[in-house]
Structure formats: C-alpha cells, structure tokens
Amino acid sequence: MAGKIVIIFDFDRTLIEDDSDRWVFTRMDLTQLFRDLRPTLPWNSLMDRLLEEMHVLGKSIDDIADCLRGMPLHPSVVSVVKQAHALGCDLKVASDSNQFYIRTILEHYGIYSCFSEIITNPAVVDKGRLRIFPYHGSAAPHGCDLCPSNLCKGRIIEQIKVSLSESESKRLIYIGDGGNDFCPTLKLAAGDFVLPKKDFPLLSRISKNSNLVKAKVCEWNSSEDLAKILGKLIECMSNEDKISSSTTQL
C-alpha cells in the first residue's frame, strides 16, 4: 500500500549532501563576488547574477554540469529513493535550487525518473548562458511572510494536496532542513510526517512552535540515518494502510 504515500524532499543538504548553489559558485571561484553582492540581492537573483559572471568568464553549460556531477549524493539515499519508487510511493522534490541543477545531479545518479515532479525555480539556456527565474513571479506574489518571495513551499504542499485523488486517501512525508521548510510543515495533517535534519533551522523552528505542527516529527542527522528512518517509515505506513484497508473490507 506504499502507493498511498507521497514523499516530498527538499534538495540541498537533504536529498544531496551539500548546497548546490554554493557548490557551483565556490568551485567557479566566485565566493568573493557572492559576498560582495549578498547584501544587495535576493538569493534567486544573486544566483542568476553569478551565472552571468560565469558566462563572462568563459564557463560553459557543460562546465557547470560537470561541476554539478561532483556533488555527493549518499548511496544509501540513492537506494531508499529507488526502493520507495519501486514500492509505488509518489516522490517529489520541492526546492529553492533550480531545474537545471536538480535534473543534472539526479540524472547523474540514475534516479531522476523516480520523481514524478520537480518543483523549483525554472532554468533556461539563453544565448549560451544559464538563466534562473523565480518559481513565483512578481506578477503573482504568494503573500507568505514565512517564505522568500520567489518560492512558497507551503503553497506547493497545498497544490499537491489539491491534485491528489479524492477517492483514495494519501499520507505525506516531508523531508527538509532549512527555515523555508517550516511553512510546508505547517500544511501537513495529523496523519502525515515531517523529517527535519538535526541541528538545522527547520528542527529549531518546529521545537519553538510545536503547538502549530500537526504532523508527527522524526529527526535525522545523516544521510545514512535518513535512509534508515525513511525506509522503516514507509514499511510501517504501508502496514498500517493494509490493516486499515482489511478492516474496512470486513
């Protein structure tokens, strides 16, 4: 009954070991420019500006892709993603990274096809350079005070819930680490789960606002830990659904 489970992964420092934006600009020797511009631009616009500088410096799309393929993704996470997909779980990514970075890394590790949806900032190639645009454009602001202007993950969870079939109940597992993962956590129901990373902002915000969180909380502190917890959780939820289904049929 794993087909009744929807798993939403944050990307940076959750599904992958590091932050994809920082991974690229540090390896392209743009850390100082990042520091200079950080106070003046929102993150999404800053990343687009750094990509412009990479293009000026002669870095190609292939150079960026090669850099991304060096991003660590723990084998245990690759394994649990494949396992969850094989069991029928609906896997999605909700991230403030971008389509190009996420697709390149997931394809490199052979798990891109395991995900039904990648919800993130769009990326396009324009005259030989990579451009990043906000998921929520300025023409239609999301109005959420908890999230950056370009992406509200809480709204994404709401959209996922609306898209689910009313004829079959689904349970959500949300996995994240950052402060922008708190808003989607608040959209989860009592039968759902949130998996925050230990010693990161999401867990801190949950701890300070536990009365607002309806979902069950399961902490993790490493990729191996996450894979074990997620695997066991899928098994337990599947067994619960089987028992519930059998009881209903009696």
Regions inferred by a protein language model and the residue ranges of each:
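Generic detector of short alpha-helix boundary/capping microenvironments
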Residues: M1-A2, D145
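Alpha-helical substrate-recognition element adjacent to the catalytic core
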Residues: A2-P122, D126
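C-terminal cap/substrate-recognition subdomain and adjoining C-terminal extension
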Residues: S76-K82, A86-D90, S97-L250
